Every structure is written in structure tokens, then in C-alpha cells.
Amino acid sequence: MVAALHGQVVKLTINSKDYLNPMDIQLSHKGDKEALKLKSDFIITLCDLIAGGKDGLQNDEKGIIDECIRHIYDKYFENPVPENMPLLEDLYDALLAHKNPKVERIANSLVLYVHGSQNYFNHHTNVDSGNRIMCFDIRDLGNQLKELGMLIVQDAVWNRVSQNRERKIATRYYCDEFHLLLKEKQTAIYSVEIWKRFRKWGGIPTGLTQNVGDFLRSEEIEGILGNSDFVYLLNQNAKDQAILADKLGLSDKQLSYVTNSEPGSGLILFDNVVIPFVDKYPTDTKTYRIMNTKPEESVQKEDAI
């Protein structure tokens, strides 16, 4: 669909030549300090995911990371050209230079992503983000980098939201497999915060998932649901229905509309209104041929496009 609409598909894989730099920062009208504060929040979350372990980073460790972050952007703030944008490697070097055993542990955790086989995100961004429709494809990124990739893409979208806000343009953001961002506490807390920030800054975020159970079991789910006006439910299994009834307050009658329901039918929750719906997508259309994923219907999507 993105190709048919002349959008840009960015494939993020270990062997890809398309790069996203997690250190990219979007300067706002509020000045460097405000932008850096938001960026620091993201990078600390990234480090927490990599080096935090079961209990997460301690506050003193986060404080040292924050201090290092403030220094490595000095060159870029003095002359904000692309080649002066810091890399993950600059953070790694700054942490080592701090000569603190606790921080050295964090730096050692970053080695794999800076000098090791998973250093895909240690490059300057070379993706042209000028297209109005962009798709970041992380399907082949691998388990080691997938969660990091989702977090980094989310931050790249935030940079676009921030940029578009200056131009008074709304930004629509669709995140598939959204439950993965809520699986780990570190990424879940940040994702809820970015969800709220998107809405406040003119973004229109939409999370999609087939793993409703995992999604609703997250400790941070209330922060997502409380900041979402619209919920779209299709057919659900019995186990997930019980969770939906508890989290969304659905009655047995309402749940019947997502029990063994046909494709294109289910429930819409809008504010405090619950609406059953049937939406049969016409199969004789170009968009159906492009978006159809049923293997039994051998459709040549290239011909459709």
C-alpha cells in the first residue's frame, strides 16, 4: 500500500544500507535545552533496555548517562550540521571517560551495539524523511535488535511529530505489534509517555496488535487506554475476551460480537459508546488486491500496484 501511494519503505535489517541514528535530535522553537531534555529521556530508556537487567538502571547511573548526553551534543549545538550529530559510539566513549566502575558496566553492555556484530544503529541517518508517507520495516531485524528497533523508530517518528508541529501539521503514526513495546517495563513506561506526548504535540498514534492478552496484561496499559478515544476490536479468543471484559468493562452481549465473528466485523469503542459493526471490504477493488494477505488467494500484488 505504501508503494502504491508513492511513499517510502525503509527496511531496517543488519545488512541494510538504510540507517537510523538513535542519537538524532530535532531542535524545537523552545530551544536546545528542551530538545535535549526529551532526547535524554529516550537515550536513558535505550540504555536501560540494553544494560538495565531485571531491576533496571539505578538513579545514579541514569544521572551519569544524562551528564554524558549533555556534553556529547555540544558540537552539534554549536554547528547543527548532519555530520556533527553524535553517534551511539560517542556516548560509549563518554561513559568510558567517566572512569566509574558502575558506568563502565553500562559502556561494556553497549560494546555489542557499537563495535560488535549488532552495530547497525551506530551510523548517521541516511534516510530521506521528506516523504509524506513512510514505512519502517523491521520484520527482518532479528530478535536481538527488534525491540531496540521499535523504540528507535518511535523516536524517529517523534522527531517528525516535533518538526510537523512547527508547521502546524498533524502526524499519523501506526505501530504494528505494539504489544512488544509494552512487554519490558523500560520500553512500556517510555511508550506511554511518548503516546501522551504525541497527542499533545499534534500526533495521532494508533497501536495495532493480534496479541491482545499480552497487550492488556502490561502494567502500563491504563496509560495507553486512558489516552485513546477509539478502540477497534475484531474476533477474539475466549481467554482474551475475559481480559477485555475486565479491562474495558464489556458485557457478555457485547463480547458476543467478537466471538467467532466474521472478518470485518466486531466492536468499536468510542469514548463511552460501544458500537457493533460489520464492514465487508469489497474484494473487487485495487486496494483489496494490494492489501490482501490470504495465501489461498494467489494475488500478484505487483500487478495490482
Feature locations, PLM:
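Short hydrophobic alpha-helical runs that function as membrane-insertion/retention elements
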Residues: 9-12, 204-208, 231-234
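Long, positively charged, glycine-interspersed low-complexity recognition regions
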Residues: 199-207, 227, 246-247
